[in-house]
């Protein structure tokens, strides 16, 4: 197996980060797909668990129940104050974001984030992945929603979220900058500063530092500033169109005019932009490549001649890989009636692990597997390759774009340019 050029802080699969497999080890526990079955497994076997394993199981159950929105179950397992490992803490922050953005459980988010911030302050919880600012931003926004304005203002002022969002390299975790801007705008709006919030979100959408959850926030703030929501849809579309055109012109320069095989993909060196690193090697036509779907059925890529085909290479432990999926989902939805196909191709990992990960997330995209990395010898994830209807490579790109909307704009532009130049 070739060594990956990691666009990661955390290497290997999520399971590789956990307690070694034992008879009742955490790895076995994590391979149970449904949290309901995990709960049953734990309660049937807890008497046989060592203290360390019992803690790991409780932490895993707390995270997974929270991700599902079952606060009663979460509270039950959190009551013992389990110690979270690195992956569990990361997943905990994702679950809290989901609780805020989708479930709108603001009181619970305010309470839970405050508890974890207190633990971080006392040193009983460790933030090894730099996500404390997410807890602070969520706490601020939740308090703003609850009318606790002074607490919200104090928390957002002390958060490192602005600094993290302003960093030149914020393309690791999903929607880092856009989430911060959304929560900052929520606080400013509640604090009687709707114009600041309006300008913040206008700029965010114009520059593609945006995601779908921000639309509702922006519409509420638009009504505060303009007196009604009349004209909002048109205004938002104008900002989104401006952002798309910007990335269309950037992407246009990446078009592969002469896609002769063999073709080596490259990416700029992170610290030496004038140097390039190889990311994949394409040395055979699509018709000679067959990969397995997640159900084990073979898929010959040559069957997609006549369609624009996108292959995105990923692994379960690659955080930016999975962060990009939300943008891909928007593209797939837009082209569902077109001659278009997108696969996310998992590398290096066995089918069982990928199936559990895909079900739990859930991953809504079609998955293929290349466990031995034979098709394109990929050396950097995430990497995507776009083929024209004749099977020629027309675009390739590595890395996560930094926001759901920017990822969507960039891939959509690649699809549109490929379509228009190959009619």
Feature locations, PLM:
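Generic helix N-cap/helix-start motif at coil->alpha-helix transitions
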Residues: 18-25, 49-60, 84-97, 127-138, ...
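Helix-turn-helix repeat elements of alpha-solenoid scaffolds
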Residues: 28-43, 63-77, 102-119, 148-164
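Flexible helix-coil transition and linker loops at the boundaries of alpha-helical arrays
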Residues: 39-55, 78-88, 102, 118-130, ...
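N-proximal helix/coil linker or "cap" segments that precede and/or mark the start of modular domains
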Residues: 210-288, 302-304, 356
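A short beta-strand-turn-helix
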Residues: 288-309, 334-335
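Conserved redox-active cysteine motifs that mediate thiol-disulfide chemistry
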Residues: 305-306, 313-330
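Structural microenvironment flanking redox-active thiols in thiol-disulfide oxidoreductases
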Residues: 322-361, 370-375
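Thiol/disulfide oxidoreductase modules built on the thioredoxin-like
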Residues: 357-363, 370-417
């Amino acid at each position: 197996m070739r060594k990956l050029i990691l666009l990661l802080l955390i290497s290997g699969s999520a399971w590789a980060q956990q307690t070694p497999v034992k008879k009742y080890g955490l790895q076995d526990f994590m391979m149970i797909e449904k949290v309901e079955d995990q709960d049953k497994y734990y309660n049937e076997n807890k008497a046989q668990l060592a203290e360390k394993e019992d803690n790991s199981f409780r932490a895993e159950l707390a995270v997974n129940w929270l991700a599902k929105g079952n606060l009663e179950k979460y509270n039950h397992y959190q009551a013992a104050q389990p110690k979270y490992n690195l992956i569990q803490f990361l997943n905990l922050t994702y679950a809290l974001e989901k609780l805020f953005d989708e479930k709108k459980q603001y009181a619970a988010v305010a309470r839970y984030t405050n508890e974890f911030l207190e633990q971080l302050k006392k040193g009983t919880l460790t933030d090894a992945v730099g996500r404390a600012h997410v807890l602070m931003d969520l706490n601020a926004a939740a308090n703003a929603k609850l009318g606790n304005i002074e607490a919200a203002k104090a928390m957002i002022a002390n958060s490192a979220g602005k600094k993290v969002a302003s960093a030149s390299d914020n393309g690791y975790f999903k929607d880092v900058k856009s989430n911060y801007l959304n929560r900052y705008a929520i606080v400013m709006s509640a604090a009687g500063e709707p114009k600041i919030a309006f300008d913040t979100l206008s700029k965010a959408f114009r520059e593609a530092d945006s995601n779908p959850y921000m639309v509702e926030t922006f519409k509420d703030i638009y009504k505060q500033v303009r007196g009604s929501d009349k004209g909002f849809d048109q205004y938002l579309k104008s900002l989104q169109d401006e952002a798309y055109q910007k990335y269309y012109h950037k992407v246009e320069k990446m078009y592969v005019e002469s896609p002769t095989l063999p073709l080596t993909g490259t990416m700029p060196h992170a610290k030496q932009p004038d140097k390039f690193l190889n990311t994949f090697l394409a040395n055979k036509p699509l018709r000679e490549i067959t990969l397995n779907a997640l159900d084990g059925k073979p898929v010959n890529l040559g069957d997609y001649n006549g369609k624009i085909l996108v292959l995105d290479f990923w692994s379960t432990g690659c955080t930016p890989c999975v962060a990009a999926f939300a943008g891909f989902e928007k593209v797939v939805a837009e082209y569902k009636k077109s001659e278009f196909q997108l696969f996310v191709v998992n590398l290096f990992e066995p089918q069982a692990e990928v199936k559990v990960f895909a079900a739990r997330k859930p991953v809504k995209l079609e998955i293929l597997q290349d466990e031995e990395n034979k098709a394109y010898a990929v050396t950097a994830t995430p990497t995507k390759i776009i083929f024209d209807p004749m099977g020629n490579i027309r675009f390739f790109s590595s890395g996560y774009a930094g926001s759901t909307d920017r990822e969507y704009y960039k891939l959509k532009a690649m699809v549109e340019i490929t379509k228009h130049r190959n009619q």
